[in-house]
């Protein structure tokens, strides 16, 4: 395959969103009289409880994705698939994260997100760890989102984050709706990042960008992920065509 063709057929699977598609206005905050504030707070708390979405998960069945480097070589891709399996948990700088791995196989853990916390040339900012069966403690001076990677071909490894980590919005295709994402953003307005996960697509962006360029622009995250997945499928088919040509 020619270099130019390779460049045109890059297979993006992990997309760190810079989302700059739409412009939006600003919704002004409401002012209330002093005598109404107590009642307003009570109503707000009630609505928040009704609209809350349980996004915090600490037990994960980490799927085996195989060796992504081997897959890259077999399919002649310039950039390999993302091995990241998001947890929706954020590790603060130097925060100790205790993780329990069941079974007799090790997995990898990462703290930090490429092209979000660091560019592709700043690998040192993204910390990787080998998690052996049993209890493991990890930490990163930079902090970042926590991810797992199971190199096994198929199967799952149960992994539990026992202590550490802060919940952040994690939108999953087939599990959540646009309203769920809105509720997540309301629950965690100061989250380190927001992640949108499709079958083979992972988008990472700041809450401000997600709200501005998705929610306020009336873009459905479900349709956004489906479009990226269709684009990915097209690129894979095109790569197969070029490989067999």
Per-region residue spans from a language model:
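Short, flexible loop/turn elements at secondary-structure junctions
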Residues: 3, 34, 152, 207-209
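Hydrophobic alpha-helical targeting segments used for export or membrane insertion
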Residues: 12-22
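Beta-strand-enriched, solvent-exposed domains that form extended recognition/catalytic surfaces
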Residues: 37-175
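A general structural signal for short secondary-structure junctions and capping/turn motifs
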Residues: 89, 138, 185-188, 193-196, ...
């Amino acid at each position: 395959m020619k270099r130019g063709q390779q460049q045109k057929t890059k297979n993006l699977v992990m997309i760190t969103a810079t989302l700059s598609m739409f412009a939006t206005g600003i919704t002004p905050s409401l002012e209330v009289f002093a005598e109404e504030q107590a009642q307003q707070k009570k109503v707000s708390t009630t609505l928040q409880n009704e609209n809350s979405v349980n996004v915090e998960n600490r037990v994960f069945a980490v799927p085996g994705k195989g060796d992504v480097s081997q897959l890259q070589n077999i399919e002649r891709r310039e950039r390999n698939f993302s091995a990241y399996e998001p947890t929706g948990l954020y590790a603060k700088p130097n925060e100790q994260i205790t993780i329990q791995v069941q079974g007799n196989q090790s997995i990898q853990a990462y703290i930090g997100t490429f092209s979000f916390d660091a560019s592709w040339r700043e690998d040192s900012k993204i910390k990787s760890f080998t998690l052996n069966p049993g209890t493991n403690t990890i930490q990163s001076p930079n902090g970042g989102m926590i991810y797992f990677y199971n190199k096994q071909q198929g199967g799952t490894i149960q992994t539990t984050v026992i202590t550490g980590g802060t919940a952040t919005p994690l939108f999953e295709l087939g599990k959540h709706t646009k309203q769920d994402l809105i509720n997540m953003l309301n629950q965690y307005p100061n989250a380190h990042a927001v992640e949108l996960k499709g079958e083979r697509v992972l988008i990472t962006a700041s809450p401000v960008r997600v709200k501005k360029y998705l929610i306020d622009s009336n873009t459905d995250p479900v349709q956004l992920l489906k479009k990226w997945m269709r684009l990915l499928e097209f690129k894979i088919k095109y790569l197969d065509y070029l490989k067999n040509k």
